[in-house]
Amino acid sequence: MEIGGVPVVTLSSGRGMPILGMGTAENNLQGSERVKLAILKAIEVGYRHFDTAFVYQTEGSLGEAVAEALQNGLIKSRDELFITSKLWCADAYPDHVLPALQNSLRNLKLEYLDLYLIHWPVSLKPGKFVHPIPKDEIFPIDYKSVWAAMEKCQMLGLTKSIGVSNFSCKKLHYLMATANIPPAVNQVEMNPIWQQQKLRDYCKTNNIMVTAYSPLGAKGTMWGSSGVMDSEVLNQISQVRGKSVAQVSLRWVYEQGASLLVKSFNEERMKENLKIFDWELSPEDLKNISELPQRRVSTGDPFVSINGPFKSVEELWDDEV
């Protein structure tokens, strides 16, 4: 099945998700007219999957864009869109999950989400978001009770599917040991220079869809890397294929069986990022990409604390670094 030329994958929840979506996270972006206009343009050129989070402060802008798209006739029904948001760590407590989701729905002016994710496998001191995160306010997450609250949200119809983000194989195993509804998605960093083979294999075995964030390495962000866009191997492949480096990287992610999130507010790049489904990488291309040096860029360092549940980046990712 396709929507506007974008393949749709069926999640373990039985719900369809466009395999390519638009992300809305950016340094100091917050909600703005610029974000709303970019989302409207994305809908116009064919995007139907949008990813936000409470902590991004873009839920309001996305909600305004959806309302305008309906009003302007860009879409006929909200059901044409797939919208994801995320539970922030300060709300990762069993009695906070439902109110947090309801707050996101108010921000978005929607009756339901298509997907709600636990943003990180950690809890923070409840209350207002503070940046940087105080190192003495990082606590272990209670996987069982928080996930049970997520399951309740799905059973109430406030979200059609539930999942996680930034979970290692070990943390997924913890969660699934007591889950009644398995996570439909694990959203993680994934690109040619951080390929996540072990995690992808685990998720495939357990029918969890991997969604790749930063498929181009998040170049230009505070924490991102130019490693993907500057890769000599990817540049050589792009020249031979007559595609951009971005298209080669996105196509590689897609060919690994993952869904992916892209973020550009430039109309031409938005269109370019959609043009990855009618061609293929060669076996030689795939072999060369598989041999690229690997490096995690999104380390999760803000959640590492000598007094917290994760005393090192290695502990946070269970040595999947």
Swiss-Prot record:
Coiled-coil residue spans: none
Record organism: Papaver somniferum
Enzyme Commission numbers on file: 1.1.1.-
Gene that encodes the chain: COR2
Binding-site residues, substrate: H119
Record GO terms (molecular function): oxidoreductase activity, acting on the CH-OH group of donors, NAD or NADP as acceptor
Localization (cell): Cytoplasm, Cytosol
EC top class named in words: oxidoreductase
Pfam families linked: Aldo_ket_red
CC per GO annotation: cytosol
Site (Lowers pKa of active site Tyr): K86
Chain sites annotated for binding NADP(+): 214-273
PROSITE patterns: ALDOKETO_REDUCTASE_1, ALDOKETO_REDUCTASE_2, ALDOKETO_REDUCTASE_3
Family recorded in the similarity comment: Belongs to the aldo/keto reductase family.
Membrane-spanning ranges: none
Keyword field: Cytoplasm, NADP, Oxidoreductase
Stated name of the protein: Non-functional NADPH-dependent codeinone reductase 2
Source organism superkingdom: Eukaryota
Active-site annotation: Y56
PANTHER family: ALDO/KETO REDUCTASE
